[in-house]
C-alpha cells in the first residue's frame, strides 16, 4: 500500500484521535486550512450544540442532509417541521440530519447555543444540532467551504449560501450529491432519498 493511500485512510482516525488532546482539535479539524484537500464530509469535525467536538466520520455509511438553520426566519416553521418529519420516517433507514445555526442572514439566529437548543426542542428535534457557525466568508466553517465547491454542491449565481435553510444531500461515502436552495422545502428531498438510502 502506498504512503499516500495509507495517509488518506488514517487521516479521519488521526483527526478524531486529536480531538481528545486539548488545543489540537481546533488546528487539526475545526479550523483546518486544508479543507480543499478533503475528499468527503467524513474528514471534518464540528462542535455540537453543547460545545463538544464531533468527528463527522461518525456519519460514514449514512445518508445526510446538512442545512443551515435560523429560528426567526419566515421559513423556520416549514423547514423544522418537515426536517423533523423526514428524520422520524427515515432515520431507521440511515438518514441523518445535521443542522448548523447561522446568524449571517438577516440576523435571524441571534440566540446562544443553549437558546437555539431550547427553541429546537419545541419542534421535538431528534436530529443532530451543531453550534452556531458562519457559512460564508473567511470565517465560514471548513465543511461549508468544502460543500460549496463540490461539483454537485455549487450554487446558482455563485457558490455562496444565499439564505437560511440551504440544504446539501450527502451520500453514504460523504460526497455531496445535490444542493437545494433556501426556497426548496425539505419534502422535495424525499424523492431523491431512495437513490441513496
Swiss-Prot record:
Picking any one GO molecular function of the record gives: glutathione peroxidase activity
Record: active site: 73
- What is this protein's tissue specificity according to the annotation? Present primarily in testis. Expressed in flagella of epididymal sperm. Isoform Cytoplasmic: Highly expressed in testis. Present in spermatogonia, spermatocyte and spermatid (at protein level).
Top EC class for this record:
oxidoreductase
Gene Ontology annotations of biological process type: apoptotic process; arachidonate metabolic process; cerebellum development; chromatin organization; dendrite development; lipoxygenase pathway; multicellular organism growth; negative regulation of ferroptosis
Q: Which reaction does it catalyse?
A: a hydroperoxy polyunsaturated fatty acid + 2 glutathione = a hydroxy polyunsaturated fatty acid + glutathione disulfide + H2O; 2 glutathione + H2O2 = glutathione disulfide + 2 H2O; tert-butyl hydroperoxide + 2 glutathione = tert-butanol + glutathione disulfide + H2O; cumene hydroperoxide + 2 glutathione = 2-phenylpropan-2-ol + glutathione disulfide + H2O
Keyword Transit peptide in the entry? The reply is yes
Task: Please give the subunit comment from the record.
Answer: Monomer. Has a tendency to form higher mass oligomers. Interacts with FUNDC1; this interaction promotes GPX4 recruitment into mitochondria through TOM/TIM complex where it is degraded by mitophagy.
Q: Which PANTHER family match?
A: GLUTATHIONE PEROXIDASE, PHOSPHOLIPID HYDROPEROXIDE GLUTATHIONE PEROXIDASE
Name of the featured protein: Phospholipid hydroperoxide glutathione peroxidase
Q: Name the species this protein comes from.
A: Rattus norvegicus (Rat)
This protein's gene is called Gpx4
Amino acid at each position: 500500500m502506498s504512503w499516500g493511500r495509507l495517509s488518506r485512510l488514517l487521516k479521519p482516525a488521526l483527526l478524531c484521535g486529536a480531538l481528545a488532546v486539548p488545543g489540537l482539535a481546533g488546528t487539526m479539524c475545526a479550523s483546518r486550512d486544508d479543507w480543499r484537500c478533503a475528499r468527503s464530509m467524513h474528514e471534518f469535525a464540528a462542535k455540537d450544540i453543547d460545545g463538544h467536538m464531533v468527528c463527522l466520520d461518525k456519519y460514514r455509511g449514512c445518508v445526510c442532509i446538512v442545512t443551515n438553520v435560523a429560528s426567526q426566519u419566515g421559513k423556520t416553521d416549514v423547514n423544522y417541521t418537515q426536517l423533523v418529519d423526514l428524520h422520524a420516517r427515515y432515520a431507521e433507514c440511515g438518514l441523518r440530519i445535521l443542522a448548523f445555526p447561522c446568524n449571517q442572514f438577516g440576523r435571524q439566529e441571534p440566540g446562544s447555543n443553549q437558546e437555539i437548543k431550547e427553541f429546537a426542542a419545541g419542534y421535538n428535534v431528534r436530529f443532530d444540532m451543531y453550534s452556531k457557525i458562519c457559512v460564508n466568508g473567511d470565517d465560514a466553517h471548513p465543511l461549508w467551504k468544502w460543500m460549496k465547491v463540490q461539483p454537485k454542491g455549487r450554487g446558482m449565481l455563485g457558490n455562496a449560501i444565499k439564505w437560511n435553510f440551504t440544504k446539501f444531500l450527502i451520500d453514504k461515502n460523504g460526497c455531496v450529491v445535490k444542493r437545494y436552495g433556501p426556497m426548496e422545502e425539505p419534502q422535495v428531498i424525499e424523492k431523491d432519498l431512495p437513490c441513496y438510502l
